């Protein structure tokens, strides 16, 4: 009986170790539901040998904190300027494993069809985090709604705030709002500057519904796969990066999102 019990215990331990080993081989990737998780789920079908678990982010979750704490192995939801801001805020250094796609920032309205119809003192909802706030102001400038101070010429290297608006001919009122909440504010504001992923989640088509849209040319806000430096050369991360930048994934992005999400140049 003692031998049988010992043998059963040994089997249980072996199964436990095997399960732990299998878990260790699984990559946990934190991602926004749209389009990031959808793209990752396509990768799972494209490359069944790559074992990944997609952890969809809920409102308020910080995927960089999850990564820093080891709760996930990588994340896929952000662009480089936001990542740099997060590295400063968290006192951490991360590694970019792949550059995948661009989600052009857009200006939306349920009240107006053309910027010329926007009245004076109209309200404009913009993201409240530093990088996307600056990005929104540069977009408003590109549409002729405001003008920033002369030193703000490069959105990739300078962060503008509402205090840096030099000209505001319509006296627009800039309202800083949590990015995921902005689509819900569309009925309450005159204009809303919305990130591509949140626009898609809200059922908007950036390519069709936006009054003004960022150009994809030389856009510094490409979305990236990010990991910890100690995993940067992990074969699983490298395999995922290769899949995400493959021609097959680029074609999936083009067909699925019809210009609302734009793949970067894929690897051959």
Where are these regions (language model features)?
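Short, polar/charged alpha-helical segment
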Residues: 26, 30-53, 62
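A conserved helix-loop-strand patch within extracytoplasmic ligand-binding domains
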Residues: 97-147, 250
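Beta->alpha turn/N-cap motifs
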Residues: 34, 58-60, 75-84, 101, ...
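Short helix-initiation/N-cap motifs at beta->coil->alpha
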Residues: 55-65, 152-184
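Pocket-flanking alpha-helical
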Residues: 60-91, 107, 113, 199-203
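Periplasmic-binding protein-like
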Residues: 98-109, 134-141, 200-242, 244-268
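Ligand-binding "clamshell"
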Residues: 85-97, 110-112, 186-188, 193, ...
């Amino acid at each position: 009986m003692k031998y049988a019990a010992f043998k059963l215990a040994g089997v249980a331990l072996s199964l436990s170790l095997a399960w732990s080993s299998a878990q260790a081989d699984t990559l946990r990737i934190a991602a926004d539901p749209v389009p990031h998780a959808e793209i990752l789920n396509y990768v799972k079908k494209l490359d069944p040998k790559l074992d990944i678990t997609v952890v969809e982010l809920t409102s308020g979750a910080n995927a960089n904190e999850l990564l820093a704490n080891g709760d996930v192995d990588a994340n896929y939801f952000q662009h480089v300027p936001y990542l740099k801001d997060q590295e400063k805020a968290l006192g951490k250094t991360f590694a970019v494993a792949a550059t995948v796609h661009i989600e052009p920032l857009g200006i939306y309205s349920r009240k107006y069809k053309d910027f010329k119809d926007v009245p004076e003192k109209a309200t404009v909802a913009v993201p409240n985090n530093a990088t996307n706030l600056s990005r929104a102001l540069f977009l408003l400038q590109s549409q002729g709604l405001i003008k920033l101070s002369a030193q703000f010429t490069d959105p990739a290297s300078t962060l503008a705030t509402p205090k840096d608006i030099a000209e505001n001919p319509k006296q627009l009122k800039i309202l800083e709002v949590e990015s995921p909440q902005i689509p819900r504010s569309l009925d309450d504001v005159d204009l809303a500057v919305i990130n591509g992923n949140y626009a898609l989640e809200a059922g908007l088509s950036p390519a069709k519904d936006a009054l003004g849209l960022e150009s994809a040319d030389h856009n510094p806000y490409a979305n990236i796969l990010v990991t910890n430096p100690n995993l940067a050369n992990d074969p699983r991360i490298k395999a995922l990066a290769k899949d995400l930048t493959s021609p097959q994934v680029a074609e999936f992005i083009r067909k699925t999102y019809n210009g609302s999400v734009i793949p970067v140049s894929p690897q051959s």
